[in-house]
Curated annotation (Swiss-Prot):
Domain of life: Bacteria
InterPro entries from the UniProt entry: Ribosomal_uL5, Ribosomal_uL5_bac-type, Ribosomal_uL5_C, Ribosomal_uL5_CS, Ribosomal_uL5_dom_sf, Ribosomal_uL5_N
Signal peptide: none
Keyword Ribosomal protein set for record: yes
Protein name, per record: Large ribosomal subunit protein uL5
Purpose of the protein: This is one of the proteins that bind and probably mediate the attachment of the 5S RNA into the large ribosomal subunit, where it forms part of the central protuberance. In the 70S ribosome it contacts protein S13 of the 30S subunit (bridge B1b), connecting the 2 subunits; this bridge is implicated in subunit movement. Contacts the P site tRNA; the 5S rRNA and some of its associated proteins might help stabilize positioning of ribosome-bound tRNAs.
Gene Ontology biological process terms from the UniProt entry: translation
Record's keyword annotation contains Glycoprotein: no
């Protein structure tokens, strides 16, 4: 059973009861997942940017967008409009497919993994996790990687509080660390 159907059939009714909500539309749901990678070396090394774009597309199943510098920063040798990273925004079926792969396949492959931190919520029910290396994803092969790079993964939910967001993600199978 896919994560999307599991959400509709089991998670949503359970959250409706557990959170004491009156309407099905009040139940928190995942709106989008954003993968972001900042590349400091992209200003000087264009091959790093190309490799990163290819990796992000492989991981997400969607073409990555090049993020560019808004301002020139002389100390970092960056001019306005220079490529400095890449990001992917996932919605709909691709989002649920990525979340399922991330929770069930990628997270357990992290070295010394004891669960994700329950403190990474932003106060509005959105969760951000930093991944130190891209090799945890099964789509990435070790031979094709030139350097190990991390990324930020933000899960944006419609939850109004951190408690609702945590309840939603833990029902989806996110392994939170016990305090």
């Amino acid at each position: 059973m896919s994560l999307k159907t599991r959400y509709r059939e089991t998670i949503r009714p359970k959250l409706l009861k557990d959170l004491g909500l009156k309407n099905v539309h009040q139940v928190p749901k995942v709106q989008k997942v954003t993968l972001n990678r900042g590349l400091g070396e992209a200003a000087t090394n264009s091959k790093a940017l190309e490799a990163s774009l290819k990796e992000m597309a492989t991981i997400s199943g969607q073409k990555a967008l090049v993020t560019r510098a808004k301002k020139a920063i002389a100390t970092f040798k960056i001019r306005q409009g220079m490529p400095i990273g890449c990001s992917v925004t996932l919605r709909g079926d691709r989002m649920y497919a990525f979340l399922e792969r991330f929770i069930n396949l990628a997270l357990p492959r992290i070295r010394d993994f004891r669960g994700v931190s329950p403190k990474s919520f932003d106060g509005r029910g959105n969760y951000t996790i930093g991944v130190k290396e891209q090799l945890i994803f099964p789509e990435i092969t070790f031979d094709k990687v030139d350097t190990i790079r991390g990324m930020d993964i933000t899960i944006v939910t419609s939850a109004s509080s951190d408690e609702q967001g945590k309840a939603l993600l833990s029902e989806m199978g996110m392994p939170f660390r016990k305090k």
